[in-house]
Protein backbone atom coordinates (compact mmCIF):
# COMPACT_ATOMS: atom_id res chain seq x y z
CA UNK A 1 0.00 0.00 0.00
CA UNK A 2 2.83 2.40 0.89
CA UNK A 3 4.59 1.59 -2.39
CA UNK A 4 1.49 2.25 -4.42
CA UNK A 5 0.79 5.53 -2.66
CA UNK A 6 4.28 6.87 -3.25
CA UNK A 7 4.20 5.67 -6.85
CA UNK A 8 0.95 7.57 -7.45
CA UNK A 9 2.46 10.69 -5.94
CA UNK A 10 5.51 10.36 -8.16
CA UNK A 11 3.36 9.89 -11.26
CA UNK A 12 1.23 12.85 -10.28
CA UNK A 13 4.29 15.13 -10.00
CA UNK A 14 6.04 14.06 -13.19
CA UNK A 15 4.30 16.64 -15.26
CA UNK A 16 4.72 19.77 -13.18
CA UNK A 17 7.32 18.90 -10.51
CA UNK A 18 11.03 19.41 -10.74
CA UNK A 19 13.41 16.59 -11.57
CA UNK A 20 15.18 16.59 -8.11
CA UNK A 21 11.85 16.20 -6.36
CA UNK A 22 10.86 13.36 -8.65
CA UNK A 23 14.19 11.63 -8.09
CA UNK A 24 13.82 11.94 -4.33
CA UNK A 25 10.31 10.52 -4.44
CA UNK A 26 11.45 7.63 -6.59
CA UNK A 27 14.30 6.86 -4.18
CA UNK A 28 11.88 6.86 -1.27
CA UNK A 29 9.58 4.48 -3.08
CA UNK A 30 12.48 2.13 -3.73
CA UNK A 31 13.46 2.11 -0.06
CA UNK A 32 9.92 1.36 1.05
CA UNK A 33 9.58 -1.38 -1.55
CA UNK A 34 12.78 -2.99 -0.35
CA UNK A 35 11.49 -2.82 3.21
CA UNK A 36 8.26 -4.56 2.25
CA UNK A 37 10.14 -7.41 0.63
CA UNK A 38 12.41 -8.05 3.68
CA UNK A 39 11.16 -10.61 6.16
CA UNK A 40 12.76 -11.71 9.43
CA UNK A 41 14.48 -15.08 9.35
CA UNK A 42 12.52 -18.04 10.51
CA UNK A 43 12.86 -19.01 14.15
CA UNK A 44 13.12 -15.44 15.43
CA UNK A 45 10.56 -13.69 17.59
CA UNK A 46 9.24 -10.18 17.38
CA UNK A 47 9.22 -7.87 20.41
CA UNK A 48 6.28 -5.53 20.77
CA UNK A 49 7.35 -2.11 22.03
CA UNK A 50 5.41 0.43 24.06
CA UNK A 51 4.34 2.41 20.96
CA UNK A 52 2.72 -0.67 19.42
CA UNK A 53 5.47 -1.36 16.90
CA UNK A 54 7.51 -4.55 16.92
CA UNK A 55 11.12 -5.28 16.26
CA UNK A 56 12.19 -7.78 13.67
CA UNK A 57 14.48 -9.80 15.89
CA UNK A 58 14.96 -10.34 19.59
CA UNK A 59 18.39 -9.33 20.83
CA UNK A 60 19.18 -11.86 23.53
CA UNK A 61 21.52 -10.57 26.32
CA UNK A 62 23.43 -12.96 28.56
CA UNK A 63 22.36 -12.94 32.22
CA UNK A 64 24.45 -10.94 34.68
CA UNK A 65 26.91 -12.80 36.84
CA UNK A 66 26.74 -12.37 40.64
CA UNK A 67 29.81 -10.13 40.48
CA UNK A 68 28.16 -7.95 37.83
CA UNK A 69 24.94 -7.75 39.85
CA UNK A 70 26.91 -6.68 42.92
CA UNK A 71 28.77 -4.07 40.87
CA UNK A 72 25.44 -2.81 39.48
CA UNK A 73 24.00 -2.42 42.99
CA UNK A 74 27.12 -0.55 44.10
CA UNK A 75 26.84 1.74 41.09
CA UNK A 76 23.19 2.49 41.88
CA UNK A 77 24.06 3.21 45.50
CA UNK A 78 26.92 5.50 44.48
CA UNK A 79 24.68 7.34 42.02
CA UNK A 80 22.06 7.86 44.73
CA UNK A 81 24.66 9.17 47.19
CA UNK A 82 26.07 11.57 44.62
CA UNK A 83 22.59 12.78 43.77
CA UNK A 84 21.85 13.42 47.44
CA UNK A 85 25.11 15.31 47.89
CA UNK A 86 24.43 17.39 44.80
CA UNK A 87 20.94 18.32 45.99
CA UNK A 88 22.19 19.22 49.46
CA UNK A 89 25.00 21.37 48.10
CA UNK A 90 22.63 23.20 45.76
CA UNK A 91 20.09 23.80 48.51
CA UNK A 92 22.75 24.98 50.94
CA UNK A 93 24.26 27.37 48.39
CA UNK A 94 20.83 28.71 47.50
CA UNK A 95 20.02 29.15 51.19
CA UNK A 96 23.26 31.04 51.83
CA UNK A 97 22.79 33.20 48.75
CA UNK A 98 19.27 34.05 49.87
CA UNK A 99 20.56 35.09 53.29
CA UNK A 100 23.28 37.21 51.69
CA UNK A 101 20.74 38.82 49.36
CA UNK A 102 18.49 39.64 52.30
CA UNK A 103 21.39 41.26 54.15
CA UNK A 104 22.40 43.27 51.09
CA UNK A 105 18.84 44.42 50.49
CA UNK A 106 18.57 45.38 54.13
CA UNK A 107 21.74 47.44 53.86
CA UNK A 108 20.49 49.16 50.69
CA UNK A 109 17.08 49.95 52.07
CA UNK A 110 18.60 51.26 55.28
CA UNK A 111 20.61 53.71 53.20
CA UNK A 112 17.49 55.06 51.48
CA UNK A 113 15.01 56.00 54.11
CA UNK A 114 15.18 52.77 56.15
CA UNK A 115 11.70 51.36 55.42
CA UNK A 116 12.51 48.32 57.60
CA UNK A 117 11.27 48.15 61.15
CA UNK A 118 13.83 48.95 63.89
CA UNK A 119 13.95 45.28 64.92
CA UNK A 120 14.66 44.13 61.35
CA UNK A 121 17.33 46.78 60.90
CA UNK A 122 19.08 45.76 64.11
CA UNK A 123 18.90 42.08 63.14
CA UNK A 124 20.49 42.80 59.75
CA UNK A 125 23.28 44.82 61.35
CA UNK A 126 23.98 42.11 63.92
CA UNK A 127 24.05 39.41 61.24
CA UNK A 128 26.58 41.41 59.25
CA UNK A 129 28.70 41.96 62.36
CA UNK A 130 28.59 38.24 63.19
CA UNK A 131 29.70 37.36 59.65
CA UNK A 132 32.68 39.70 59.99
CA UNK A 133 33.53 38.31 63.44
CA UNK A 134 33.73 34.79 61.98
CA UNK A 135 36.59 35.77 59.63
CA UNK A 136 40.31 36.14 60.38
CA UNK A 137 43.14 37.35 58.21
CA UNK A 138 46.25 35.15 57.96
CA UNK A 139 49.37 36.77 56.53
CA UNK A 140 53.05 36.00 55.98
CA UNK A 141 52.24 32.49 54.69
CA UNK A 142 55.16 30.59 53.18
CA UNK A 143 54.60 30.25 49.43
CA UNK A 144 54.91 26.45 49.44
CA UNK A 145 52.13 26.00 52.00
CA UNK A 146 48.70 25.19 50.59
CA UNK A 147 45.13 25.41 51.76
CA UNK A 148 45.28 21.98 53.41
CA UNK A 149 48.08 23.11 55.73
CA UNK A 150 46.18 26.24 56.73
CA UNK A 151 43.04 24.22 57.35
CA UNK A 152 44.95 21.68 59.45
CA UNK A 153 46.50 24.39 61.61
CA UNK A 154 43.29 26.38 62.18
CA UNK A 155 40.76 23.52 62.41
CA UNK A 156 41.25 22.81 66.15
CA UNK A 157 39.51 26.10 67.01
CA UNK A 158 36.24 25.15 65.34
CA UNK A 159 34.61 24.08 62.07
CA UNK A 160 35.88 26.07 59.09
CA UNK A 161 33.33 27.19 56.51
CA UNK A 162 35.78 28.40 53.87
CA UNK A 163 39.39 29.41 53.22
CA UNK A 164 39.98 32.13 50.64
CA UNK A 165 43.56 32.28 49.36
CA UNK A 166 44.51 34.96 46.82
CA UNK A 167 46.42 33.50 43.84
CA UNK A 168 48.78 35.20 41.40
CA UNK A 169 47.76 34.35 37.83
CA UNK A 170 51.33 34.84 36.56
CA UNK A 171 53.32 32.77 39.06
CA UNK A 172 50.39 30.42 39.84
CA UNK A 173 51.20 30.72 43.54
CA UNK A 174 49.30 32.34 46.35
CA UNK A 175 50.18 35.86 47.43
CA UNK A 176 51.08 34.94 50.99
CA UNK A 177 47.79 35.68 52.75
CA UNK A 178 44.37 34.10 53.23
CA UNK A 179 41.02 34.63 54.94
CA UNK A 180 39.67 31.86 57.16
CA UNK A 181 35.94 31.86 57.90
CA UNK A 182 34.58 29.87 60.86
CA UNK A 183 31.03 28.87 61.72
CA UNK A 184 31.03 30.76 65.03
CA UNK A 185 32.75 34.00 66.11
CA UNK A 186 34.28 32.34 69.18
CA UNK A 187 36.39 30.06 66.97
CA UNK A 188 37.79 33.06 65.11
CA UNK A 189 38.51 34.84 68.40
CA UNK A 190 40.45 31.85 69.76
CA UNK A 191 42.43 31.54 66.52
CA UNK A 192 43.23 35.24 66.70
CA UNK A 193 44.48 34.91 70.28
CA UNK A 194 46.46 31.68 69.93
CA UNK A 195 47.75 31.58 66.33
CA UNK A 196 49.29 35.03 65.91
CA UNK A 197 53.11 34.79 65.48
CA UNK A 198 53.00 30.98 65.47
CA UNK A 199 55.74 29.32 63.39
CA UNK A 200 54.22 27.71 60.29
CA UNK A 201 56.42 26.47 57.48
CA UNK A 202 59.46 28.28 58.86
CA UNK A 203 57.70 31.65 59.16
CA UNK A 204 55.86 33.44 61.93
CA UNK A 205 52.38 33.94 60.52
CA UNK A 206 50.34 37.06 61.25
CA UNK A 207 46.72 36.63 62.31
CA UNK A 208 44.34 39.56 62.64
CA UNK A 209 40.89 40.89 61.87
CA UNK A 210 39.84 41.82 58.30
CA UNK A 211 40.22 45.46 57.34
CA UNK A 212 36.45 45.98 56.96
CA UNK A 213 35.78 45.33 60.64
CA UNK A 214 35.79 49.05 61.43
CA UNK A 215 32.29 49.72 60.15
CA UNK A 216 30.90 46.92 62.31
CA UNK A 217 32.94 47.75 65.43
CA UNK A 218 30.07 49.43 67.34
CA UNK A 219 27.84 46.38 66.87
CA UNK A 220 30.71 44.05 67.83
CA UNK A 221 31.30 46.03 71.02
CA UNK A 222 27.60 45.85 71.80
CA UNK A 223 27.59 42.07 71.32
CA UNK A 224 30.62 41.71 73.59
CA UNK A 225 28.91 43.80 76.26
CA UNK A 226 25.81 41.62 76.07
CA UNK A 227 27.95 38.47 76.27
CA UNK A 228 29.40 39.58 79.62
CA UNK A 229 25.97 39.13 81.18
CA UNK A 230 26.25 35.40 80.49
CA UNK A 231 28.96 33.32 82.13
CA UNK A 232 29.46 31.30 78.97
CA UNK A 233 32.62 29.68 77.67
CA UNK A 234 33.40 28.17 74.28
CA UNK A 235 34.98 24.69 74.05
CA UNK A 236 36.44 23.35 70.79
CA UNK A 237 38.45 20.33 69.61
CA UNK A 238 36.21 17.96 71.58
CA UNK A 239 36.86 14.26 71.04
CA UNK A 240 34.22 12.66 68.83
CA UNK A 241 33.57 9.86 71.33
CA UNK A 242 32.69 12.26 74.16
CA UNK A 243 29.10 13.25 74.89
CA UNK A 244 27.51 16.34 76.42
CA UNK A 245 27.38 14.62 79.80
CA UNK A 246 31.07 13.71 79.62
CA UNK A 247 32.07 17.32 78.97
CA UNK A 248 29.73 18.55 81.68
CA UNK A 249 31.19 16.13 84.23
CA UNK A 250 34.70 17.36 83.43
CA UNK A 251 33.92 21.09 83.58
CA UNK A 252 31.60 21.06 86.58
CA UNK A 253 34.70 20.68 88.75
CA UNK A 254 35.03 24.48 88.46
CA UNK A 255 31.48 25.32 89.52
CA UNK A 256 27.81 24.65 88.99
CA UNK A 257 26.82 24.49 85.32
CA UNK A 258 23.53 25.88 84.03
CA UNK A 259 23.80 24.40 80.54
CA UNK A 260 26.25 22.37 78.45
CA UNK A 261 25.49 21.83 74.77
CA UNK A 262 27.61 20.50 71.92
CA UNK A 263 26.65 21.64 68.41
CA UNK A 264 25.45 18.74 66.30
CA UNK A 265 25.37 17.94 62.61
CA UNK A 266 21.72 17.61 61.50
CA UNK A 267 22.51 14.89 58.96
CA UNK A 268 24.65 12.54 61.07
CA UNK A 269 23.50 13.49 64.57
CA UNK A 270 27.11 13.57 65.79
CA UNK A 271 28.54 16.63 67.48
CA UNK A 272 30.76 18.94 65.45
CA UNK A 273 33.59 19.15 67.96
CA UNK A 274 32.59 22.34 69.75
CA UNK A 275 29.99 23.63 72.16
CA UNK A 276 29.10 26.16 74.86
CA UNK A 277 29.02 25.84 78.64
CA UNK A 278 27.27 28.36 80.88
CA UNK A 279 28.16 28.63 84.58
CA UNK A 280 26.19 30.19 87.38
CA UNK A 281 29.17 32.27 88.53
CA UNK A 282 31.62 34.35 86.53
CA UNK A 283 34.58 33.09 88.56
CA UNK A 284 33.80 29.52 87.53
CA UNK A 285 34.00 30.42 83.85
CA UNK A 286 37.31 32.23 84.36
CA UNK A 287 38.80 29.26 86.21
CA UNK A 288 37.62 26.86 83.51
CA UNK A 289 39.22 28.92 80.74
CA UNK A 290 42.54 29.27 82.54
CA UNK A 291 42.72 25.61 83.56
CA UNK A 292 41.23 23.72 80.61
CA UNK A 293 42.64 25.57 77.61
CA UNK A 294 45.11 23.24 75.83
CA UNK A 295 44.16 20.42 78.20
CA UNK A 296 44.85 17.02 76.61
CA UNK A 297 41.55 15.16 76.73
CA UNK A 298 41.62 11.86 74.87
CA UNK A 299 44.61 12.83 72.74
CA UNK A 300 43.11 16.12 71.56
CA UNK A 301 44.00 19.49 73.02
CA UNK A 302 40.89 21.36 74.09
CA UNK A 303 40.57 25.00 73.01
CA UNK A 304 38.67 26.96 75.62
CA UNK A 305 37.84 30.66 75.66
CA UNK A 306 35.22 33.15 76.78
CA UNK A 307 32.13 33.48 74.61
CA UNK A 308 32.18 36.78 72.71
CA UNK A 309 28.51 36.70 71.71
CA UNK A 310 25.33 36.22 73.74
CA UNK A 311 22.93 33.34 73.05
CA UNK A 312 20.95 34.43 70.00
CA UNK A 313 18.59 31.67 68.88
CA UNK A 314 16.54 34.06 66.75
CA UNK A 315 19.55 35.04 64.67
CA UNK A 316 20.93 31.57 64.05
CA UNK A 317 19.86 29.25 61.21
CA UNK A 318 17.05 26.81 61.84
CA UNK A 319 19.49 23.91 61.65
CA UNK A 320 23.17 23.89 62.57
CA UNK A 321 25.54 24.75 59.75
CA UNK A 322 23.05 26.79 57.74
CA UNK A 323 21.37 23.74 56.16
CA UNK A 324 17.70 24.25 55.26
CA UNK A 325 15.28 22.03 57.21
CA UNK A 326 13.94 20.44 54.02
CA UNK A 327 17.44 19.46 52.95
CA UNK A 328 18.22 17.98 56.35
CA UNK A 329 15.02 15.92 56.33
CA UNK A 330 15.67 14.74 52.77
CA UNK A 331 19.22 13.74 53.62
CA UNK A 332 18.11 11.83 56.70
CA UNK A 333 15.41 9.98 54.74
CA UNK A 334 17.77 9.12 51.89
CA UNK A 335 20.45 7.93 54.31
CA UNK A 336 17.94 5.71 56.09
CA UNK A 337 16.84 4.29 52.74
CA UNK A 338 20.41 3.46 51.72
CA UNK A 339 21.09 1.86 55.10
CA UNK A 340 17.96 -0.25 54.79
CA UNK A 341 18.96 -1.38 51.31
CA UNK A 342 22.40 -2.36 52.58
CA UNK A 343 20.86 -4.38 55.39
CA UNK A 344 18.50 -6.23 53.05
CA UNK A 345 21.27 -6.91 50.52
CA UNK A 346 23.65 -8.13 53.22
CA UNK A 347 21.00 -10.41 54.70
CA UNK A 348 20.19 -11.89 51.28
CA UNK A 349 23.84 -12.67 50.57
CA UNK A 350 24.35 -14.24 53.98
CA UNK A 351 21.19 -16.30 53.64
CA UNK A 352 22.64 -18.03 50.57
CA UNK A 353 26.18 -18.48 51.85
CA UNK A 354 25.84 -19.29 55.56
CA UNK A 355 25.98 -22.92 56.69
CA UNK A 356 23.56 -23.74 59.55
CA UNK A 357 25.23 -24.81 62.75
CA UNK A 358 28.71 -23.57 61.86
CA UNK A 359 28.68 -19.78 61.69
CA UNK A 360 26.25 -17.36 63.27
CA UNK A 361 24.84 -14.99 60.63
CA UNK A 362 24.66 -12.23 63.22
CA UNK A 363 28.39 -12.44 63.80
CA UNK A 364 29.11 -12.42 60.08
CA UNK A 365 26.84 -9.46 59.36
CA UNK A 366 28.36 -7.43 62.14
CA UNK A 367 31.46 -6.54 60.14
CA UNK A 368 29.88 -4.31 57.44
CA UNK A 369 26.97 -3.02 59.50
CA UNK A 370 27.87 -2.75 63.13
CA UNK A 371 31.55 -1.87 63.38
CA UNK A 372 32.17 0.31 66.38
CA UNK A 373 33.85 3.66 65.73
CA UNK A 374 37.54 3.61 66.53
CA UNK A 375 39.01 5.94 69.12
CA UNK A 376 40.77 8.91 67.56
CA UNK A 377 44.00 9.83 69.31
CA UNK A 378 45.07 12.46 66.85
CA UNK A 379 47.31 15.23 68.12
CA UNK A 380 51.08 15.37 67.94
CA UNK A 381 51.26 18.84 69.40
CA UNK A 382 48.83 21.67 70.11
CA UNK A 383 47.21 22.71 66.86
CA UNK A 384 48.47 19.83 64.69
CA UNK A 385 46.21 16.93 63.77
CA UNK A 386 47.81 13.70 62.65
CA UNK A 387 46.37 10.73 60.79
CA UNK A 388 44.15 8.13 62.37
CA UNK A 389 45.34 4.52 62.70
CA UNK A 390 42.76 1.80 63.45
CA UNK A 391 43.41 0.39 66.90
CA UNK A 392 42.30 -3.20 66.40
CA UNK A 393 39.65 -5.18 64.50
CA UNK A 394 36.17 -3.89 65.36
CA UNK A 395 34.11 -5.78 67.90
CA UNK A 396 31.24 -7.59 66.13
CA UNK A 397 27.96 -5.99 67.14
CA UNK A 398 24.62 -6.49 65.43
CA UNK A 399 22.79 -3.21 64.84
CA UNK A 400 19.29 -3.59 63.35
CA UNK A 401 18.27 -1.02 60.77
CA UNK A 402 15.22 1.13 61.38
CA UNK A 403 12.16 -0.14 59.56
CA UNK A 404 13.81 -3.38 58.37
CA UNK A 405 12.76 -6.72 59.82
CA UNK A 406 15.37 -9.35 59.10
CA UNK A 407 14.57 -12.89 60.27
CA UNK A 408 18.21 -13.93 59.94
CA UNK A 409 19.26 -11.47 62.63
CA UNK A 410 16.70 -12.62 65.17
CA UNK A 411 18.21 -14.92 67.82
CA UNK A 412 20.24 -17.38 65.75
CA UNK A 413 20.32 -20.81 67.43
CA UNK A 414 24.06 -21.26 66.98
CA UNK A 415 24.85 -18.10 68.98
CA UNK A 416 24.06 -19.88 72.22
CA UNK A 417 26.70 -22.50 71.49
CA UNK A 418 29.39 -19.87 71.06
CA UNK A 419 28.63 -17.74 74.13
CA UNK A 420 29.88 -20.16 76.86
CA UNK A 421 33.17 -20.56 75.03
CA UNK A 422 33.51 -16.79 74.73
CA UNK A 423 32.82 -16.31 78.45
CA UNK A 424 35.40 -18.98 79.30
CA UNK A 425 38.02 -17.25 77.17
CA UNK A 426 37.29 -13.93 78.89
CA UNK A 427 37.70 -15.54 82.30
CA UNK A 428 41.09 -16.89 81.26
CA UNK A 429 42.27 -13.57 79.82
CA UNK A 430 41.05 -11.28 82.61
CA UNK A 431 40.96 -11.92 86.36
CA UNK A 432 37.82 -10.82 88.18
CA UNK A 433 39.43 -7.56 89.33
CA UNK A 434 40.83 -6.67 85.90
CA UNK A 435 37.86 -7.62 83.71
CA UNK A 436 36.94 -4.69 81.39
CA UNK A 437 33.64 -2.94 81.91
CA UNK A 438 30.79 -3.59 79.53
CA UNK A 439 30.00 -0.83 77.04
CA UNK A 440 26.58 -0.28 78.59
CA UNK A 441 28.17 0.25 81.99
CA UNK A 442 30.59 2.79 80.57
CA UNK A 443 27.81 4.73 78.86
CA UNK A 444 25.98 5.25 82.16
CA UNK A 445 29.00 5.90 84.33
CA UNK A 446 28.55 8.81 86.75
CA UNK A 447 31.60 11.01 87.28
CA UNK A 448 32.01 14.44 88.80
CA UNK A 449 34.43 16.57 90.74
CA UNK A 450 38.21 16.53 90.44
CA UNK A 451 38.36 12.91 89.25
CA UNK A 452 36.04 13.49 86.29
CA UNK A 453 38.80 14.23 83.80
CA UNK A 454 40.72 11.11 84.82
CA UNK A 455 37.62 8.93 84.45
CA UNK A 456 36.82 10.31 81.00
CA UNK A 457 40.40 9.72 79.92
CA UNK A 458 40.17 6.10 81.10
CA UNK A 459 36.93 5.66 79.19
CA UNK A 460 38.59 6.85 76.00
CA UNK A 461 41.87 4.99 76.40
CA UNK A 462 40.16 1.65 77.01
CA UNK A 463 39.12 1.60 73.36
CA UNK A 464 42.71 1.29 72.12
CA UNK A 465 45.32 -0.67 74.04
CA UNK A 466 48.88 0.26 73.20
CA UNK A 467 51.54 -2.32 72.37
CA UNK A 468 54.40 0.16 72.84
CA UNK A 469 56.56 0.54 75.96
CA UNK A 470 58.92 3.46 76.52
CA UNK A 471 62.00 3.12 78.76
CA UNK A 472 63.29 6.33 80.28
CA UNK A 473 66.43 7.08 82.32
CA UNK A 474 68.05 3.85 81.15
CA UNK A 475 71.24 5.11 79.44
CA UNK A 476 73.16 8.32 78.74
CA UNK A 477 73.75 9.49 75.15
CA UNK A 478 77.42 8.56 75.56
CA UNK A 479 76.44 4.98 76.47
CA UNK A 480 74.68 4.35 73.15
CA UNK A 481 76.53 1.85 70.95
CA UNK A 482 75.76 -0.65 68.22
CA UNK A 483 75.01 -3.42 70.70
CA UNK A 484 72.40 -1.53 72.74
CA UNK A 485 69.48 -2.27 70.43
CA UNK A 486 70.27 -5.98 70.38
CA UNK A 487 70.61 -6.10 74.16
CA UNK A 488 67.23 -4.41 74.66
CA UNK A 489 65.59 -6.72 72.12
CA UNK A 490 67.01 -9.80 73.85
CA UNK A 491 65.99 -8.65 77.32
CA UNK A 492 62.45 -7.64 76.30
CA UNK A 493 62.05 -10.83 74.28
CA UNK A 494 61.60 -12.64 77.59
CA UNK A 495 58.14 -11.05 77.90
CA UNK A 496 56.86 -11.54 74.34
CA UNK A 497 57.50 -11.07 70.64
CA UNK A 498 59.32 -7.78 69.98
CA UNK A 499 58.40 -6.14 66.67
CA UNK A 500 60.99 -3.37 66.78
CA UNK A 501 63.15 -1.24 69.06
CA UNK A 502 63.75 2.49 68.52
CA UNK A 503 66.45 4.43 70.41
CA UNK A 504 65.50 8.12 70.36
CA UNK A 505 67.68 11.03 71.52
CA UNK A 506 65.62 14.10 72.39
CA UNK A 507 67.22 17.52 72.74
CA UNK A 508 65.62 19.61 75.47
CA UNK A 509 66.19 23.01 73.87
CA UNK A 510 67.50 24.94 70.89
CA UNK A 511 70.84 25.73 72.53
CA UNK A 512 73.92 23.82 71.43
CA UNK A 513 74.65 22.64 74.97
CA UNK A 514 71.03 21.71 75.74
CA UNK A 515 70.47 18.48 77.65
CA UNK A 516 69.80 15.33 75.63
CA UNK A 517 67.70 12.54 77.08
CA UNK A 518 67.44 9.02 75.66
CA UNK A 519 64.13 7.21 75.21
CA UNK A 520 63.97 3.57 74.16
CA UNK A 521 60.72 2.49 72.52
CA UNK A 522 59.86 -1.22 72.39
CA UNK A 523 56.89 -2.38 70.33
CA UNK A 524 55.41 -5.78 71.21
CA UNK A 525 52.92 -7.81 69.21
CA UNK A 526 50.27 -7.82 71.96
CA UNK A 527 49.20 -5.36 74.63
CA UNK A 528 49.36 -8.04 77.33
CA UNK A 529 53.06 -8.54 76.59
CA UNK A 530 53.60 -4.79 76.95
CA UNK A 531 52.00 -4.74 80.40
CA UNK A 532 54.02 -7.77 81.47
CA UNK A 533 57.28 -6.08 80.44
CA UNK A 534 56.35 -2.85 82.22
CA UNK A 535 55.61 -4.68 85.45
CA UNK A 536 58.98 -6.43 85.29
CA UNK A 537 61.19 -3.51 84.17
CA UNK A 538 59.69 -0.46 85.85
CA UNK A 539 61.79 0.52 88.85
CA UNK A 540 64.69 -1.82 88.01
CA UNK A 541 68.27 -0.56 88.25
CA UNK A 542 70.43 -0.62 85.13
CA UNK A 543 74.00 0.69 85.21
CA UNK A 544 73.35 2.73 88.34
CA UNK A 545 70.12 4.20 86.95
CA UNK A 546 66.53 3.54 88.00
CA UNK A 547 64.60 2.67 84.85
CA UNK A 548 61.13 4.10 84.26
CA UNK A 549 58.95 1.87 82.05
CA UNK A 550 55.61 3.23 80.84
CA UNK A 551 52.96 2.60 78.20
CA UNK A 552 53.35 4.91 75.19
CA UNK A 553 50.42 6.17 73.17
CA UNK A 554 49.90 3.90 70.16
CA UNK A 555 48.64 6.66 67.88
CA UNK A 556 51.61 8.90 68.54
CA UNK A 557 54.00 6.02 67.94
CA UNK A 558 52.32 5.02 64.68
CA UNK A 559 52.67 8.61 63.45
CA UNK A 560 56.38 8.77 64.42
CA UNK A 561 55.70 11.23 67.24
CA UNK A 562 58.22 10.30 69.92
CA UNK A 563 58.18 13.63 71.77
CA UNK A 564 55.65 12.80 74.50
Curated annotation (Swiss-Prot):
Disulfide pattern: none
Stretches for region Disordered: 37-61, 421-442
Gene Ontology CC entries for this record: cell junction; nucleoplasm; ribonucleoprotein complex
Gene3D superfamilies linked: 3.30.70.330
Basic and acidic residues composition bias: residue spans: 432-442
GO biological process: apoptotic process; mRNA processing; regulation of alternative mRNA splicing, via spliceosome; RNA splicing
Top-level division of the source organism's lineage: Eukaryota
InterPro entries xrefs: Nucleotide-bd_a/b_plait_sf, PUF60-like, PUF60_regulator, PUF60_RRM1, PUF60_RRM2, PUF60_RRM3, RBD_domain_sf, RRM_dom
GO function term, MF aspect, one: RNA binding
Subcellular location: Nucleus
N6-acetyllysine modified-residue sites: 256, 459
Residue ranges annotated for the RRM domain, each copy included: 134-212, 231-309, 467-554
Site of covalent link Glycyl lysine isopeptide (Lys-Gly) (interchain with G-Cter in SUMO2): 48, 85, 424, 463
Region described as Inhibits homodimerization: spans on this chain: 1-521
Region Inhibits transcriptional repression, interaction with ERCC3 and apoptosis induction: start-end pairs: 82-564
Keyword terms: Acetylation, Apoptosis, DNA-binding, Isopeptide bond, mRNA processing, mRNA splicing, Nucleus, Phosphoprotein, Repeat, Repressor, Ribonucleoprotein, RNA-binding, Transcription, Transcription regulation, Ubl conjugation
Coarse class of the protein's main subcellular location: nucleus
Sequence positions bearing Phosphoserine: 117, 249
Function of the molecule: DNA- and RNA-binding protein, involved in several nuclear processes such as pre-mRNA splicing, apoptosis and transcription regulation. In association with FUBP1 regulates MYC transcription at the P2 promoter through the core-TFIIH basal transcription factor. Acts as a transcriptional repressor through the core-TFIIH basal transcription factor. Represses FUBP1-induced transcriptional activation but not basal transcription. Decreases ERCC3 helicase activity. Is also involved in pre-mRNA splicing.
Assembly description: Homodimer. Associates with the spliceosome. Found in a complex with RO60 and Y5 RNA. Found in a complex with FUBP1 and far upstream element (FUSE) DNA segment. Interacts directly with ERCC3. Interacts with CDK7 and GTF2H1. Interacts with SRSF11/P54. Interacts with ARGLU1; interaction may be involved in ARGLU1-mediated modulation of alternative splicing.
Domain-level remarks: The third RNA recognition motif, called PUMP domain, is atypical and may rather mediate homodimerization and/or protein-protein interactions.
Family as reported in the entry's similarity comment: Belongs to the RRM half pint family.
Protein's name in the database: Poly(U)-binding-splicing factor PUF60
Phylogenetic classification of the source organism: Eukaryota, Metazoa, Chordata, Craniata, Vertebrata
